[in-house]
């Protein structure tokens, strides 16, 4: 599960400092404090523009993965919400809008629904097992007319309208999914950028646990930095902060850390 550790990198140049040993220790402590307090307070730099969303489910939300976690070839671009170990849970539209895309694949999302909202965002619901009747009817008609199962359907604007809280699909385990869950994304309408959904759903999630760091890495820039007389990287346990390291030049630091939430044994990436 090392791919769920997040390495928080901080760049600094200590070549001109008076006390190089103290500089590294104090810098690492600042990074650790930012990690802990950022996790406890829920610090986010993203501007939500005052948008509001309701919960996609009528039961308490628990996550199996969060936004930005490391994957073998990409960053995880949404929230994976647990569905109590089963498929078929009703999924509610998180805001008023219209169905802008219906996606059916063998892998990836499996079946996914895109709903465009007037507040500047589009919500994506992935790995669903089926859609609401009017959406399912539209999809089946398209599939029969084009004689294809796999498809990427784009209804006209406002052709299929939905209301906040309306059931739009049933949760599933379709596509590249390792177990029943809803993959929920938010994207900006103006440029398609992925947005972290977490700040919008904090009231539906219980999270009083701070991230836990386990390793610290020191990375000299080749030709520009040295740690303890060596150009090689040094990775040590978090308790090694009690030690002193001799360093010169330009150094990167990294922290391996995991985040946790209440009510579940899952661990998450930190960002």
What are these regions (language model features)?
Residues 125-127, 135-138:
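Short, conserved acidic/polar surface loops in the N-terminal third of protein domains
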Residues 45-122, 129-131, 148-151, 155-158, ...:
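Surface-exposed, glycine-biased beta-strand/turn segments
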Residues 1, 8-9, 13, 18-51:
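Bacterial Sec-dependent N-terminal signal peptides
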Residues 3, 9, 13-14, 24, ...:
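Intrinsically disordered, low-complexity regions enriched in small/polar residues
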Residues 136-154:
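Intrinsically disordered, low-complexity Ser/Thr- and acidic-rich flexible linkers and loops
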Residues 179-186:
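Histidine-centered catalytic micro-motifs
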């Amino acid at each position: 599960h090392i791919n769920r550790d997040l390495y928080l990198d901080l760049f600094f140049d200590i070549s001109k400092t008076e006390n190089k040993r103290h500089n590294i220790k104090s810098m690492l402590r600042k990074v650790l404090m930012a990690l802990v307090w950022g996790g406890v307070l829920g610090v986010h730099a993203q501007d939500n523009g005052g948008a509001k969303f309701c919960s996609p489910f009528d039961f308490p939300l628990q996550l199996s993965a969060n936004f930005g976690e490391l994957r073998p070839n990409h960053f995880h671009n949404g929230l994976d919400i647990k569905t109590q170990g089963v498929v078929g849970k009703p999924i509610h539209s998180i805001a008023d809008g219209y169905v802008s895309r219906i996606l059916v694949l063998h892998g990836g999302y499996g079946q996914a629904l895109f709903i465009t909202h007037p507040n500047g965002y589009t919500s994506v619901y992935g790995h669903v097992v089926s859609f609401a009747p009017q959406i399912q009817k539209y999809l089946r008609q398209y599939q029969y007319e084009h004689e294809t199962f796999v498809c990427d359907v784009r209804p006209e604007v406002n052709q299929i309208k939905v209301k906040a809280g309306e059931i739009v699909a049933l949760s599933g385990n379709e596509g590249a999914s390792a177990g029943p869950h809803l993959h929920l994304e938010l994207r900006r309408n103006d440029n398609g950028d992925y947005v972290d959904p977490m700040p919008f759903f904090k009231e539906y999630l219980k999270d009083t646990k701070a991230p836990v760091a386990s390793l610290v890495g020191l990375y000299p820039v080749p030709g520009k930095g040295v740690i303890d007389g060596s150009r090689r990287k040094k990775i040590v346990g978090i308790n090694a902060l009690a030690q002193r390291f001799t360093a010169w030049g330009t150094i990167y630091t990294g922290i391996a850390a995991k985040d946790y939430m209440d009510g579940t044994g899952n661990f998450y990436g930190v960002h």
